[in-house]
Amino acid sequence: EPVNGPLGVQLAVQVVPNPVITQVVLEPEDNKIEPQVIEDTFSSDYGRTLNLNELQLRMKELQRWYSSNGYSLARVSGPTRVSPDGVVQLKVLIGTVAGVEVKFLNKEGEDTNEKEEPIKGKTKPWVVSREISIKPGEPFNRTQLESDIRRLYGTSLFSDVKVTLRPVTGEPGFITIVLGIVEQSTGSLSGGLGYSQSQGVFGQVQLSDSNLFGRAWDLALNITYGQFGGLANLTFTDPWIKGDNHRTSFRTSVFLSREVPQVFQSQNDGDIVSLRDYEDNNSKYAYSIDSKKNPADSRFNNVSKAGNEFPETSWFDYEGDSIALERVGGNIIFSRPLNGGDPFKKVPWQVLAGLNLQAVRPINYAGGTRPYGIPRDKIKNDRIENDEIICTSFDCADRNTLASVRLAATYNTLNDGRNPTSGNFFSFGTEQYVSIGENSPTFNRVRTSYTHFIPVKWLKLAKGCRPKEGEPENCPQALAFQIKA
């Protein structure tokens, strides 16, 4: 302030020290930072006179905390107010999501075609947006968005996802997330040759579309024909029922298969073959109707005639074909993770429930019903011990109906679903078959398995196991232990 003096007017400057810091407050209250972080950052300044230069350094520390926790748009400014009792108020502008837009791009990354019209994607926009956990009105978090992008890639529907953050005009701190989606081909026709223990050498043709009607539905037709049978299977899968917060999936299939059971391939070196007919009259031996080496010293045209004339003797009509099982049926399966209604929460537990219905018929290669089989090497002098005759179906029926309810649960803590090196995988399932009529058996089947992976670094054969200086190591190795029952 000016003061009159003997030499003229003097300017007196009155210096008032900053108050002693007692507390630092961030505004607004919903600032996403934990109180302990604020305490740890400013605790060394409490009880000391406010120094604005040091305050700026502390604000940069807060800025780094926000950035390291994914809030890359957050800005800390101030102080906006310093009270006489030492309360310092800082302002935090985190960055708020105003909305999420989906744009479809071509392979060149353009969102319009030659006619300057927007690219129309096959996928429904809600299939994309439902994988995005950041909602309008929530703070923008880079880490959260990266997880959302990984989920989009996990659908296997998109070859590229480009992210653009567009500021909202007239609304500072608000941004719109623009997702540029490049779709990949989801329809396929494939074929090949292979070998399996159940089918032997086989050929396979598969026709599928994993984005049916743009709703992420998967429809697949698989036809396999092999050395020991064939299979036709039509499967429909909805990986996430629309509108379900539990992320419930649905799968159904219908199938027709004909294959030689593994037990018939391996037992007696695959020597179990078919009988056209068989009549058990509780005798010690069963005799072939095609030979005279029997109590009647005569051949017969059919088993019924032989049984009528010699009712105390068991008879069989030998055919000699391999025995296959024809299965016609379908199933319905629902599964969901135990996420408590949060579709974006990663949880180890998943449960499954399903229904299965199928008709099973033992047949020869011509498709004729063959409920009886015989070990060929046990036939001596055109007869066989009666106890050696095999029922190839339940109760030796021409057809069995199998109806079951299936319940299962899995626990998965693997670090990588495709190439795990650590973690555990446990599964438990039970399938209860119930009788729904004649020749429909009742029984239960229980299966369980446990696998444990231990990471190791024993071999250095792969190039990724011998990285040069500055290169990342890529050397996944593990020991796996598995128990099944």
Predicted regions and their residues:
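Short regulatory "switch" loops immediately downstream of catalytic or recognition motifs
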Residues: 101-114, 257-271, 275, 337-340, ...
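Conserved long hydrophobic alpha-helices within structured protein cores
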Residues: 101-102, 250-254, 330, 440-452
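C-terminal outer-membrane beta-barrel translocator/porin domains of Gram-negative envelope proteins
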Residues: 368-485
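Gram-negative/organellar outer-membrane beta-barrel architecture
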Residues: 31-36, 63, 75, 118-126, ...
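Short acidic, glycine/proline-enriched loop segments that cap or flank alpha-helices
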Residues: 50-53, 318, 416, 438
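Periplasmic polypeptide-binding modules associated with outer-membrane biogenesis and secretion
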Residues: 1-201, 205-206, 220-240, 355-358, ...
